[in-house]
Amino acid sequence: MNKKDARIKRAVKTRKKLYKLDAIRLVIHRTCRHIYAQIIAKDNSNVLVAASTTEKLISSQLTTTSNKKAAAIVGKIIAERAIKKGIINVSFDRSGFKYHGRVKMLADRARQTGLSF
């Protein structure tokens, strides 16, 4: 089993637990260059809110899109958009990534902006 397969296995276990909770999920995905965040509905079919470093609004504020500063901006924007739609409580789905670095920064900034998880 390689590193990617192990991460996907962790992500599947987490998603099974969150599916049983029947909660709105804040899902993140991290690549070498970008970070993506989506808030997905309880029925796992609709993306309610999304933000990523590929958006012009966010990437224009940054010199690089692959650092903690970029993750913090994505966390702030996803939280603001969610609150605007009336979403305050979410479950955090880190997609098998370690809660460290950019993932932690995104989560912390989303909490500071007003999301609860």
Swiss-Prot record:
Q: Which GO terms describe its cellular component?
A: cytosolic large ribosomal subunit
Is Transcription regulation one of the keywords?
no
Molecular function via GO: 5S rRNA binding; structural constituent of ribosome
Could you tell me the keywords of this UniProt record?
Answer: Ribonucleoprotein, Ribosomal protein, RNA-binding, rRNA-binding
What is one GO biological process annotated to this record?
Answer: translation
Cite the Pfam families for this sequence: Ribosomal_L18p (PF00861)
Q: Entry's InterPro entries?
A: Ribosomal_uL18_bac-type, Ribosomal_uL18_bac/euk
Q: Does the keyword Thylakoid apply?
A: no
The family database entries (NCBIfam families) matched by this protein are listed as: L18_bact
Instruction: Share what the entry says about its subunit structure, partners included.
Output: Part of the 50S ribosomal subunit; part of the 5S rRNA/L5/L18/L25 subcomplex. Contacts the 5S and 23S rRNAs.
Please give the family membership noted in the entry.
Belongs to the universal ribosomal protein uL18 family.
What function does the entry list? Answer: This is one of the proteins that bind and probably mediate the attachment of the 5S RNA into the large ribosomal subunit, where it forms part of the central protuberance.
Q: What is this protein called in UniProt? A: Large ribosomal subunit protein uL18
Q: Which organism is it from?
A: Blochmanniella pennsylvanica (strain BPEN)
Q: What is the lineage of its organism?
A: Bacteria, Pseudomonadati, Pseudomonadota, Gammaproteobacteria, Enterobacterales
